Amino acid sequence: MDTSRKIIHIDMDAFYASVEQRDHPEFRGKPLIIGGDPNKRGVVSTCSYEARKYGVHSAMPTRQAAKLCPNGIFIHGNMAHYVEVSSQIREIFSRYTDVIEPLSLDEAYLDVTENKKGMKSATMVARDIQQTIYRELGLTASAGVSFNKFIAKIASDFKKPAGITVVAPEEAEAFLEQIPVTKFYGVGKVTAEKLHRLGIETGADLKKWSEWDLIRELHKHGYQLYRHVRGRSNNIVNPHRDRKSVGKETTFEFNVLDNRILEQSLMKFAKKVEERLIKLQKHGKTVVLKLRYSDFTTITKRLTLNEYTNDANQIYQAAALLLRESYKGQDSIRLIGLTVTNLKPVYFENLRLEGL
């Protein structure tokens, strides 16, 4: 395991909301929710820390957010402006290193093992980046510093907002033992429920399990979690990373025959995919449906649209059509997935935040 790399994960604090509060003094100190009209369909894209005190969080339906935070200020936001500010942040990163792997508009990995400032301490680099962003742009960022990307990303969320957390190689396992497993990469709702049933709540609980037992219970996720909790993970920051597809899938706790449940899953996936595509500034043209039957037979069906889209409803309609054509209730479904491929960048003037 290579522990010589110096990797920083920078995560802007409540990015969209913070930009709006910076630009609009009337929003400062108030619960601001980026998500449009709470009386219409939509989900929260992000919200200010004032709104989070009421329990509002990203991906929550805006109607629910309005109930939790009746005094909240709801706005649609301005994606083109967020893209512009994101490019300003990226320019600041480039003053320190060219080895930058963007994850979305508001977060990125930086390898500063060899940096342009000649700083030997990655902690100093991270702090300098935070101060520069605040001084020049009036925004705060949190940073995680470690020897691999997995730990750096977890660490950046540890002391939000405007915090910095450093995890040295010799501290990694002890640090990970205290972390809830829901914070581990790849642990979604289904995996989290399985871990909970197994009595695994923290990294320390996870570490008690053998590699074989985790693989038996969780398959490939078990192998990944076994490595992650021991600090073994990818430490290569890839500046040429380019997503070829965006998707979501789930394995049902019990095999499913009901088309309504399958369609509900596709709608949830479509909303998640829409959110991710907008963050990546991309839209796609091909929708792919994946079905795995109870006998583990797997099929994929695809539909290429007439135009590029990042709209959840259009994505769902295409996936639902594929489902109706492919599945006649002949056997129960173990897994369902939805992916959008054939991606390309969205021009700034066409970026949409409608319903988010």
UniProtKB/Swiss-Prot annotation:
**EC top class named in words:** transferase
Q: Which residues form the UmuC domain?
A: 7-188
What Pfam families does this protein map onto?
Answer: IMS, IMS_C, IMS_HHH
Q: Gene3D superfamilies, per this entry?
A: 3.30.70.270, 3.40.1170.60, 5' to 3' exonuclease, C-terminal subdomain, DNA polymerase, Y-family, little finger domain
What catalytic reaction does the record list?
Answer: DNA(n) + a 2'-deoxyribonucleoside 5'-triphosphate = DNA(n+1) + diphosphate
Q: Which domain of life is it from?
A: Bacteria
Q: So where does Mg(2+) get bound?
A: 11, 106
CDD domains reported for this sequence: PolY_Pol_IV_kappa
Which EC number(s) does UniProt give? 2.7.7.7
Identify the keywords attached in UniProt to this record, alphabetized.
Answer: Cytoplasm, DNA damage, DNA repair, DNA replication, DNA-binding, DNA-directed DNA polymerase, Magnesium, Metal-binding, Mutator protein, Nucleotidyltransferase, Transferase
Return one Gene Ontology term, BP aspect.
DNA-templated DNA replication
GO CC, any one term: cytosol
- InterPro entries in the cross-refs: DNA/RNA_pol_sf, DNA_pol_Y-fam_lit_finger_sf, DNA_pol_Y-fam_little_finger, DNA_polymerase-Y, DNApol_IV, PolY_HhH_motif, Rev_trsase/Diguanyl_cyclase, UmuC
* Protease as UniProt keyword: no
Q: Return the cofactor note field.
A: Binds 2 magnesium ions per subunit.
Provide the active-site residues from the annotation. Answer: 107
Summarize the protein's role.
Answer: Poorly processive, error-prone DNA polymerase involved in untargeted mutagenesis. Copies undamaged DNA at stalled replication forks, which arise in vivo from mismatched or misaligned primer ends. These misaligned primers can be extended by PolIV. Exhibits no 3'-5' exonuclease (proofreading) activity. May be involved in translesional synthesis, in conjunction with the beta clamp from PolIII.
Family designation = Belongs to the DNA polymerase type-Y family.
Mind telling me what this protein is named?
DNA polymerase IV
Q: Which gene encodes it?
A: dinB
